[in-house]
Amino acid sequence: MITFTKPLSKLIGHFEKFPGIGPRTAQRLALFILKQPESSIRDFSKALLEAHSNVGHCKKCFNLTSEEECEICRNTERNQKIICVVAETKDLLALERSREFKGTYHVIGGLISPMDSISPELLEIRSLVERVSKSDIDEIILALTPSVEGDTTSLYIGKLLTPFTKVTRIAYGLPMGSELEYVDEVTLARALEGRTNLI
C-alpha cells in the first residue's frame, strides 16, 4: 500500500471531505495542487477565504449572495408573485439551467428528516410562511427531491401555506431518491410545466 508524507495525506484527507470526491479523485486533486506554482496556490487560497468571508444568504430567499438580496430577488423582470421552494442552492441552479421558471425562489436549507435530527425549526420554513403571509403571492411551487424526506417536507409546507395561496408540486419524470441537480434541463422544464396541486 502506498503511503504519502503527512502534509500530502492531510491535503488528500481534506479533499475527501468534499461531496462526490472519493480517495482516487482526492489524490489526483492533491497531486495537481502540488504541481502548481506558488502564486497560483496563493490566489486559490485567497479566493477560498474571500468566498467564505463574503458570500452569505439573501435576506429574502436565502440563496447565496454577496449582497443583502440576491440577483434573482432584485430582478424586476422576474414574477415576484410566484415562489419556487427548493431545498438547496444547487437545486435552484439546476432549475435556472432549465430556463423554464421566471419567478423567485425560497431556499429552505435542507429537508425534514427525523432520522438525521433535522426538524422544521432548523430549516427556513418559518421565514417562508412569513414571506407568503405578508405578500400577494399567487402560487407556491414545491420543487423538492422525490424522496421520503422530500414528500414529508412538501406536505408539511403545503399544510402551512394552503390557507394563504395556491400550492403546487412539480411533476416528476424521474425515480424516487433522484437529486434535482443531476436531472437534465428538459426533464426539469417538463416537471415545471406539468406541476400539480399539492392539496
Swiss-Prot record:
Coiled coil: none annotated. One of its GO terms (biological process) is DNA repair. InterPro entries: DNA_Rcmb_RecR, Rcmb_RecR, Rcmb_RecR_Znf, TOPRIM_dom, TOPRIM_RecR. CDD domains: TOPRIM_recR. Keywords: DNA damage, DNA recombination, DNA repair, Metal-binding, Zinc, Zinc-finger. A zinc finger (C4-type) spans 58-73. Residues 81-175 form the Toprim domain. Pfam families: RecR_C, RecR_HhH, RecR_ZnF, Toprim_4. GO terms for molecular function: DNA binding; zinc ion binding. May play a role in DNA repair. It seems to be involved in an RecBC-independent recombinational process of DNA repair. It may act with RecF and RecO. PANTHER family: RECOMBINATION PROTEIN RECR. Belongs to the RecR family. This is Recombination protein RecR.
